[in-house]
């Protein structure tokens, strides 16, 4: 039983490491694409405008107003490429 637990621990560690590497890679890719598209600057401006317009400086209140607009502003090409990368990762680790 100890042998099995050891193998399970190694398998879990490898799976977790793979996920974390993927998570870092996808996050970096997404950040770069959003930066290249000008999305980050647009969302910063949108947030500033909302803070000036709103009586609230509460993060959650501002986020609730800005987030739907920000999500709609993501370039279709960026959205498609990131979703494809996620699908490829899932296909590699999940057997159907």
From Swiss-Prot:
Keyword Cytoplasm included in the entry's annotation: yes
InterPro entries for the chain: TF_ENY2, TF_EnY2_sf
Family membership noted in the UniProt record: Belongs to the ENY2 family.
Reported function: Involved in mRNA export coupled transcription activation by association with both the TREX-2 and the SAGA complexes. At the promoters, SAGA is required for recruitment of the basal transcription machinery. It influences RNA polymerase II transcriptional activity through different activities such as TBP interaction and promoter selectivity, interaction with transcription activators, and chromatin modification through histone acetylation and deubiquitination.
Molecular function, one GO term: transcription coactivator activity
Matches recorded under HAMAP family: ENY2_Sus1 (MF_03046)
Highest taxon, organism lineage: Eukaryota
Name of the encoding gene: SUS1
Name this polypeptide is given: Transcription and mRNA export factor SUS1
Keywords: Activator, Chromatin regulator, Cytoplasm, mRNA transport, Nucleus, Protein transport, Transcription, Transcription regulation, Translocation, Transport
GO process annotations (BP): chromatin organization; mRNA export from nucleus; protein transport; transcription elongation by RNA polymerase II
């Amino acid at each position: 039983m100890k042998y099995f637990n050891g193998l399970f621990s190694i398998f879990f560690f490898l799976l977790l490491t793979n996920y974390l590497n993927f998570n870092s890679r996808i996050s970096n890719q997404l950040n770069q694409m959003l930066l290249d598209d000008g999305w980050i600057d647009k969302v910063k401006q949108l947030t500033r405008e909302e803070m000036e317009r709103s009586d609230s400086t509460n993060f959650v209140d501002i986020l609730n107003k800005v987030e739907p607009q920000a999500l709609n502003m993501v370039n279709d090409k960026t959205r498609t490429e990131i979703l494809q990368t996620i699908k490829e990762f899932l296909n590699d680790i999940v057997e159907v």
